Amino acid sequence: MAALMVVGTSSHAGKSLLVTALGRLFHRRGVKVAPFKGQNMALNAYVTAEGHEIGHAQAVQAWACGLEPSVAMNPILLKPQGNMTSQVILKGKPAGVCGAVDYYRDYFEPGWQAVVEALAELQSQYELVICEGAGSPAEVNLRHRDLTNMRVALHLGAPTLLVTDIDRGGALAHVVGTLQVLPPEERALIKGIVINKFRGSLALLQPGLDWLAQYTGVPVVGVLPWLEMALPEEDSMGLFDRRGARKQAQLEIVVIRLPRIANFTDFDALEAEPSVRVRYVSPDGYLGHPDAIILPGSKATIPDLLALEASGMAAQIRAYGGVILGICGGLQILGSTIDDPEGFEGHPGRHPGLGLIEATTVFEPLKITRQVQVESRLPAGEPVVGYEIHQGQTTFAPTLEALFAEPHLGVVSSNRRVWGTYLHGLLDNHAWRRHWLNALRERRGLPQLPVQSGHYREQREEMFERLADAWEPHLPIDGFAQLAGFASQV
């Protein structure tokens, strides 16, 4: 098996998007290619067909490679849940909750074993594996326990690309500093520098690139133009850059940016709707008068509920008279009570919810992770696909109407004002999303949008193609293939 490694000078340098683009470019050339990230820290998770949790970014990369996601592509997922702790997902299943010190002490050896086993599995199935690092490989205080950067590259002997974000400023210094910090055996694997998010005159930049290559001895192999892509962010920091401006929007939908927001990829398809403005509001923000509010998923539902109460946002939501949709943790928050008898989210106890639907939630040891294909009851007969990731079990009052043929997946109030579902990816289903939006439009006296079958995955495929088309002229794919050792096949 051949391998390439992509590391970055910092978080948000563009590693994930570069792996996605390379995956699609090699896939288009007929190469059996797969993505890999040994350890990911993110609250955007995806559930594979086997019921394993992996980072959503690796699922996106798998789709770009023309594959169904598998746990081998991301054997370790860390899901931050506040108080400097994270839930450890090892080989797709929960393994415990711990802080950083305990994690490095207790999970390094089993974690590395999981990484090695996953790589061996991918080696047996694919011609090329494109590995992604995390953060920066130059964190000297963490190198001895690093499971996902140059340790992986050394294990595979993988030629490595170093990507940097020039839009932030200081990119050349970031590259120089990163290379100087790396030990000689790791630096020797860095075969190319990729400049990302460039906008401006390449002629003005070229002297700097020439100096960088001469000073470091590593060639600059790509200068990637700035792209406005709707592919998912890996963590919630990207939400702070989403302003929601859209002049032609006829509907405004507010998503409450919970402190521990999870799976905000649920709103990618909604943001792609030309007639919809999605605005993210923090608990201490002003709700305004949107057409609908969405309470998203949360990695720590009770602390986020308490944050809503303490900030006054809970009172704003209760006083709001429009449509509200709760997804997963958001559904639990909308209910009457949340009971955590064993203290999975901290101290044991029962907490009152917002009380907007008659529903009680109890947190239990068993975590449900599964893909779902189900028929919708509202609208009737529409096929819907999505996935569940939750620990709580919710009991609904009989006065609530089931949204799906599996009643536990979601309900709506009799006045069609409060909706709740455990189904992540629900809004990716075109017909269901358009029916829901048309109900909002009807309240405003707006004409109905056409309702077509299909799924957001078709739009995602178009984005993969646009990404590959935009970056192919700026990346020496034949050269990368030669570096990886299979030039004759491309």
From Swiss-Prot:
InterPro entries according to UniProt: Class_I_gatase-like, CobQ/CobB/MinD/ParA_Nub-bd_dom, CobQ_GATase1, CobQ_N, CobQ_synth, GATase_3, P-loop_NTPase
Tell me the CDD domains matching this sequence: CobQ_N (cd05389), GATase1_CobQ (cd01750)
Which GO annotations describe the biological process of this protein?
cobalamin biosynthetic process
What are the recorded GO MF terms, alphabetically? ABC-type vitamin B12 transporter activity; catalytic activity
Q: Taxonomically, which superkingdom?
A: Bacteria
Q: Which residues form a coiled coil?
A: none
Cite the annotated pathway. Answer: Cofactor biosynthesis; adenosylcobalamin biosynthesis
Q: Does the keyword Oxidoreductase apply?
A: no
Signal sequence residues: none
| Domain GATase cobBQ-type intervals | 250-432
Q: Which Pfam families match?
A: CbiA, GATase_3
Question: Which positions are catalytic residues?
Answer: 328, 424
The entry's keywords: Cobalamin biosynthesis, Glutamine amidotransferase
Q: Belongs to which family? A: Belongs to the CobB/CobQ family. CobQ subfamily.
Q: What does this protein do?
A: Catalyzes amidations at positions B, D, E, and G on adenosylcobyrinic A,C-diamide. NH(2) groups are provided by glutamine, and one molecule of ATP is hydrogenolyzed for each amidation.
- PANTHER family attached to this UniProt entry: COBYRIC ACID SYNTHASE (PTHR21343:SF1), DETHIOBIOTIN SYNTHETASE (PTHR21343)
Q: What is this protein called?
A: Cobyric acid synthase
